[in-house]
Regions:
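Alpha/beta enzyme core
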Residues: 8, 27-44, 61-62, 66, ...
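Short, surface-exposed connector motifs at secondary-structure boundaries
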Residues: 13-18, 42-44, 71-73, 198-204
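Short glycine-enriched loops at secondary-structure junctions
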Residues: 50-52, 81-85
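Glycine-rich anion/phosphate-binding loops
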Residues: 82, 108-114
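Conserved small/polar residues in nucleotide/adenosyl-binding loops
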Residues: 211-217
Length: 219
């Protein structure tokens, strides 16, 4: 069943489970992911980057919507790291149930302005909106890029941002990086910031790029 991100992550937060997200760039990958989703009865986020969205055939997007609508497992179709207002609007028109506007590299006030604009349009269509504060690093081997220096999400700024924009979910920067981590690269995860953000904000948080990353555990 099709859901937006706000609806799905609200349930996930209440029940205490995480929701995986997979970038879908081909019919083969879509079929493989959906087969596992149905077998495991696991909610999932099917997403596309702006490059994928701009270059794949519309038939793949329609296949994503069709596969999601014919299963009883919750499925979100999400535009990840939307780089322009126009791209986000096209994704909404194409049937995406969730969009991200990533203006985190812009000055703070500009980030607020474009995010507000996206929320106004998306919420009219019952599409949830994700935004980002701070920056995600790079391992040097990902097409998604990232920055060489990580700017961690500031909890006070995050609270102000959420209140002013009306976003539904927030992607936070706690030290992860896009791509697969080389053996000699050790991320400096700030789980303390993540906890403060969780305690401060009343919307679901999104944290990205955990591929091949071993999280610390309490002994």
């Amino acid at each position: 069943m099709l859901m937006n991100m706000k609806e799905l992550l609200k349930v996930a937060d209440e029940k205490g489970f995480a929701v995986p997200a997979f970038n879908i760039g081909s019919d083969q990958l879509l079929k493989a992911v959906m087969q596992q989703v149905k077998e495991m009865k696991s909610p999932v986020i099917l997403e596309m980057s702006p490059d994928e969205f701009n270059f794949v055939e519309n038939s793949l997007i329609q296949s994503m919507i069709y596969e999601a609508s014919k299963t009883d497992v919750p499925v979100v179709i999400h535009l990840d790291h939307g780089d322009k207002y126009e791209t986000v609007v096209r994704a909404i028109q194409a049937g995406f149930t969730s969009v991200m506007i990533d203006a985190s590299k812009l000055p703070y006030e500009e980030n607020i302005a474009i995010t507000q604009k996206v929320c106004e349009v998306a919420h009219l269509a019952n599409v949830s909106v994700e935004s980002e504060l701070g920056t995600i690093g790079t391992t040097g081997n990902s097409i998604e890029g990232g920055t060489t220096g990580i700017i961690y999400t500031d909890p006070d700024q995050a609270k102000d941002f959420v209140e002013k924009t009306g976003i539904d979910t927030l992607a936070v920067a706690i030290g992860t990086a896009h791509g697969i981590y080389p053996s000699d690269m050790k991320p400096e995860l700030r789980l303390d910031i993540l906890q403060i953000l969780k305690d401060t904000l009343d919307i679901p948080l999104v944290s990205v790029s955990y591929t091949h990353l071993t999280l610390p555990t309490n002994s």
